[in-house]
Amino acid sequence: MNNLTLVTVLMLGIVSLSCQNSTETEIEKATANEGTKALDLSKEFKQHWFDGRAEVASYNLKQMRYGEAREGKAVLIFVKEPFLQDEQVKANAASSQTFDVLKLNATKKFTTGIYPYSIMQSTFSPLTTNTHAVKVTASTQEWCGQTYMQMNNRDAFKIASHSYFEGEADQSLSLNKTLLENEIWNKLRINPTEIKTGPQKLIPDFSFIRLQHIPVKAYQAEVQQQKNQDTLMTKIAYKNLDRILNIYQSTAFPFEILKWEEKTSEGDKNFTQAVLQKRLRLDYWNKNSNTFAFLRDSLQLN
């Protein structure tokens, strides 16, 4: 190979590597900037969610567990809160170090034979930018033991999981950022028409992961939406999991959740459903005196 040919080859290699690095850099930038669009909250949204009250909604629950339908209660609590990014906890008061989030506390209570189940999940979604949830937690308690799972949104999804089951025990892992089933509920309350539809990867509901003892990872799924008069249905169907989630909500603001269904390929034979009973707007954290116990009757929780 003569000197001219060698120089030409080296130059082509440098150009090729430069183009490749440039392309990779652009992809990284695009990925880093994906979903960082500022949220343009409407005046109606702010008047509703920034009024110092929460929405507490109770649901009649039919939960499938161990192949049988169990009667129970579900509660969805949506509230706007100040959030500390570094500590990733609710702040005692808003400050220059906080930003607003929409928090969902979702609970389920039902019994399996002699012993009770209690499930609670919390999802914190920013109200400043259209990004992923900043934190998700999930816990289950029953007489055999308890589990706890937490995701912190850092440079990646940092997940810690603890379980009394053999083979699960204590786990710590890092996942690439992708859509979380848990965060979809908040997104549907903020702006249901901005949900990304079509085939995509999702991390399933944390309580589903724990109850079904499946690996903590993203699974291929398809998200669809269908409007029927005054109701919007959002459907999540997982390709390699026997799971379909249908969420029904009002098309009118504040887009309240009317019911949801969790189905399998067996249809009605393995069918979880929660249907709205009552919905209240109140500062529930100030209602912890026995004199406010009647509010549980109002929510039909007793």
Annotated model-derived regions:
Residues 20-22:
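Bacterial signal peptide processing site
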Residues 151-200:
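Surface-exposed beta-loop interaction hotspot
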Residues 24-155, 194-302:
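Acidic, serine/threonine-rich low-complexity disordered tracts
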